[in-house]
Amino acid sequence: MQTTKPNTKILVDGGDPKETERLKTLIGFVDGQTTNPSLISKNPVIQAQVASGHKLSLEQQTQEYKKIVQTISPLVGEAGVSIEVFSNLKTSAEQMFAQGQDMFTWIPNAYIKYPCTHEGLRAAKRSVEHGMRVNITLCFSQEQAAAVYAATKGTKEPAYVSPFVGRLDDRGENGMDLLKNIKQMYA
């Protein structure tokens, strides 16, 4: 039996402010929200532009991302909005950090979301050293969670790790075991 309440937050994962509003109405609150370029691309405004044959440049995508995040920001609580950088396996820590610095200025409650890769962790460490709030995503193992802890150690701001429980479950692993192990390791 649990004797203390965990410091757990409810964060919406999406890119449509109207969905955030609906959920907030349904449950009465939303602590925060996570976004990423893929979720933003599914936003109805973006989808309408694409359906009309408009191809967005990276700069236009970034501007739309910023507008959407700025609309979501006042709808959520203290856990803020996690804004994921545009990245792939070839994106360097320096490139991610530069994006993160810009994105961190978009809203007052920004958390910059980096992938749990070697380069993503390097970017997160540098971000923390510059006083930025971070959320490390795509965490699939306790070893990765330990690397997140090492990269964010000493931060004065909250730092989040986003374990991918559902994907672990999809491949036949027990995702909840990862959560239990992370909680025990961080305790």
Region locations from a protein language model:
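Active-site beta->alpha loop and helix N-cap motifs at the rims of alpha/beta catalytic domains
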Residues: 5-22, 26-30, 35-129
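Catalytic alpha/beta core domains of metabolic enzymes, predominantly
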Residues: 118, 135-187
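Conserved catalytic network of the ASCE P-loop NTPase/AAA+ motor domain
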Residues: 132
